[in-house]
Regions:
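Conserved Class I S-adenosyl-L-methionine-dependent methyltransferase catalytic core
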Residues: 2, 8-29, 34-40, 48-49, ...
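Alpha-helical subdomain
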Residues: 1-72, 167-168, 172-339
Length: 339
């Protein structure tokens, strides 16, 4: 490659982006962030403790140092950086689940893109279909990893949500499809006049109740088991629907929205928290994030939607978008009422 060719350099930079996720995945799966949590250690000691090959472990930790998640101290000794600490399962704001999720996508969903584009069928759609969520509930470790990850991201979303949306007119809130209730907990802690519940599959109930109790909300927050496809969420003044619709194609998404419409009543409000894609894409950091998110959902049979696409979907489900509160890569909130 010619060093003075900016077009070639740009493509090479894109090509070189393939390997970091695999390093992070290896570090995470081998539980090296946990092993280094108590302080620096030699590759030899880590290898003996974890039953690993010393030389290959040294090479992996060296690669982790190049990525900034480990620190090479010399003499084959390594420490964990602040970034690497986020790969620990018990870290505040842990990104362990994100690493494992996108690692799976790099081996499956993204690799399937050519076939999906040829056929229009998502190879992993069963994973996020109703049967797939039931199957996920049988894998307790994977289920716990996923929902712990969602708790962290949900709390970040809730901070922004409570800043831009006034909940004073509401008394009850349902976090529909809310997992362990990270979003609900943060909203209730910010708006102390509210009570609420999580509506999700029965497999989530134990983890959700434990999390809500741990947040000091046992008296104000509960759990209602159920599925959008079997009936509406329990009645409430306000439904929260965060990053749910993008999991599904239009037909299933319409069913979910119609289920919410049936449960919310004439005076109820639905806050649809999702990404709204730009009308046109350009080579910018935010647009790359939008594209990554959309192709991720492509692999699972879902999709991100533009404002026009989302509004069309809402109207088809008997709902009326009132306004967009906040509009950014991380947070777009559409306030919705029954039509």
């Amino acid at each position: 490659m010619r060093s003075d060719d900016p077009a070639a350099a740009h493509v090479q930079e894109l090509i070189d982006g393939f390997w970091p996720i695999h390093v992070l995945t290896a570090l995470t799966q081998l539980e090296l962030p946990e092993a280094l949590a108590s302080g620096p250690a030699a590759a030899r000691d880590l290898a003996q403790r974890l039953g690993l090959d010393e030389f290959q472990l040294f090479r992996l930790l060296r690669a982790g140092s190049a990525l900034g998640v480990c620190q090479d101290l010399g003499d084959r000794r390594f420490a964990l950086t602040d970034a690497g600490a986020l790969l620990r399962r018990d870290a505040e704001g842990s990104l362990r689940g994100d690493v494992l999720f996108y690692s799976g996508m790099s081996k499956g969903g993204f690799a399937d893109i050519p076939e999906i584009v040829r056929t229009g069928r998502a190879g992993h759609s069963v994973t996020l279909g109703p049967e797939g969520f039931d199957r996920l509930g049988e894998d307790t470790d994977r289920l716990d990893d996923m929902h712990r990850t969602m708790v962290g991201s949900s709390r970040d979303v809730a901070i922004d949500l409570c800043r831009i949306y006034d909940f004073s007119a509401h008394r009850t809130v349902v976090d529909a499809g809310g997992g362990y209730g990270g979003l609900l907990a943060a909203v209730l802690q910010s708006c102390t006049h509210l009570t609420g519940s999580v509506f999700d599959l029965p497999s989530v109930e134990r983890g959700a109740l434990a999390y809500l109790k741990g947040q000091g909300l046992a008296g104000r927050a509960g759990f209602v088991p159920g599925s959008f496809f079997d009936g509406p969420p329990p009645p409430a003044d306000c439904y929260l629907l965060k990053y749910i619709i993008h999991d599904w194609d239009d037909s299933r998404a319409r069913q979910i929205l119609a289920s919410c419409r049936d449960g919310m009543g004439a005076d109820g409000v639905l806050l649809l928290i999702d990404r709204l894609l730009p009308g046109r894409f350009a080579a910018t950091p935010d647009h790359r994030r939008f594209a990554r998110a959309d192709l991720t959902m492509m692999g699972y049979g879902g999709q991100e939607r533009s404002e026009r696409e989302m509004f069309t979907l809402l109207h088809s489900a008997g709902l009326r978008p009132i306004r967009i509160v906040g509009h950014a890569w991380t947070l777009s909130v559409v306030e919705v009422r029954a039509a």
